[in-house]
Curated annotation (Swiss-Prot):
Keywords: Kinase, Nucleotide-binding, Serine/threonine-protein kinase, Transferase. It comes from Azotobacter vinelandii (strain DJ / ATCC BAA-1303). It is an enzyme of class 2 (transferase). Belongs to the pyruvate, phosphate/water dikinase regulatory protein family. PSRP subfamily. NCBIfam families: PRK05339.1 (NF003742). The keyword ATP-binding does not apply. Its EC number is 2.7.11.33, 2.7.4.28. This is Putative phosphoenolpyruvate synthase regulatory protein. It catalyses: [pyruvate, water dikinase] + ADP = [pyruvate, water dikinase]-phosphate + AMP + H(+); [pyruvate, water dikinase]-phosphate + phosphate + H(+) = [pyruvate, water dikinase] + diphosphate. Pfam families: Kinase-PPPase.
Amino acid sequence: MKRTAFFISDGTGITAETLGQSLLAQFENISFTKLTRPYIDTAEKARGMVQQINAAAERDGARPIIFDTVVNQEIRDILAKSNGFMIDIFSTFLAPLEHELISHSSYSVGKSHSISHNAHYMERIEAVNFALDNDDGARTHYYDKADLILVGVSRSGKTPTCLYMAMQYGIRAANYPLTEEDMERLQLPTALKPYREKLFGLTIDSERLAAIRHERKPNSRYSSFSQCEFEVRETEKLLRREKIPFINSTHFSVEEISAKILVEKGVERRLK
């Protein structure tokens, strides 16, 4: 079964997309075509959206699912006339919350992501810059400022995990790729030894690693199964020897990997 899902907002669309994606992920037997439509902030744009929604309904033979965080009532009324199934995220959750808190919400465009109202904005930017500056072992002299240092073989998911933790939680995460020399010595690189308490390992199934590396450097020693198998085996051996916690990233999303790391290491999120 295939359905179309729209994430519509008169702002960035981040809230609609994030919550909508989380809900759709619970329906693994359905394939969704996901379309994000930010800044639908005029009646003309809304009418254009209705045409897109109706076209998708006709194409799929089923109503598209619409997750919206549109504040403007006129625009919402126009969207409601489409052949889609609308889930108004703000009204769904704000009404019962207003009742519980005995207070009216400041229901305005971009409220959850505006720079002027977000005291953590600079924290997030600094964390992202830290992740980029300390990616792939490029710099090690700032490790004293890191909240976490991810270690593992090349292409095991260290960089996207560091960037996700920076964006989502404001965590300053560096990453360091273990080399064959490190594996053969079966001991931590000198640059990492002072920061043992900050280390967390990422490993991955050899088959998956070979497939990922093949996309980057096909038919090379780097992407061969035997090389990947060797690196994964020796890396896990090193991590166990040094008593560094690690997880296999193969079957987890970056969100799940990040959450597991923070729980295991007891690192507090800077953005709450």
